Amino acid sequence: MRKLIIGITGTFGSGKTTVAKMLKKRNILVIDADRLAMRAAKNKRVKKKILQEFGTAGRKKLAKTVFSDAKRLGRLNKIIHPPLKREIKKIMKETRKEIVIIDAPLLVEARFLDVIDCLVLVVCNNRTRTGRLVKKGFSEREIAARTGFQMSDSKKIKYADFVIDNSGARKETERQVEKLWKNITSRK
């Protein structure tokens, strides 16, 4: 039986994981790419490459280093993305779930589009997104640095099959997710 693979992406703090959690309630597999990337970074071989390249493998120091320089971030992604993509493919192959969601901020940038059947872009206005991230402990400077290295929503939208606007109330996002779910299940 062929699985339906859905990618959920969006800018840092847009609400990708919120949308993924809403869909997870429907008994489907959600793969959290950020969590897998953190696990990949702990792999001995990967950690060694990171240490050789950056002199540190600590998450906070590494984030500070790579989110201040596009070239450094690119080098980190070249180390992390290959094992991450292998792990995602392995999980997708092993699951018995008919629908699989990949929750990843860099689906488009990391060229994961060949792995998915449809792309959901979660958008959120800048003011709301920044406010939510500040409440989570990020400074406006950190937010700007991380967001600055991601493809803009206006560019990502060209790849999207669906767009969910997470700028408003949770109920409104839930309504959009329900509409998305009906569309997804009609494809199966």
Residue positions per predicted region:
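Small-molecule kinase domains that catalyze NTP-dependent phosphoryl transfer to phosphate-bearing small molecules
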Residues: 96, 114, 138-185
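ATP-binding Walker
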Residues: 14
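Hydrophobic anchor at the beta1->P-loop junction of P-loop NTPases
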Residues: 8
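Walker A/P-loop
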Residues: 17
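ATP-dependent NMP and nucleoside kinases share a basic, alpha-helical "lid"
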Residues: 87-94, 99-135
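P-loop (Walker A) phosphate-binding loop of NTP-binding proteins
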Residues: 11, 23
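ATP-dependent small-molecule kinase phosphotransfer cores
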Residues: 35-96
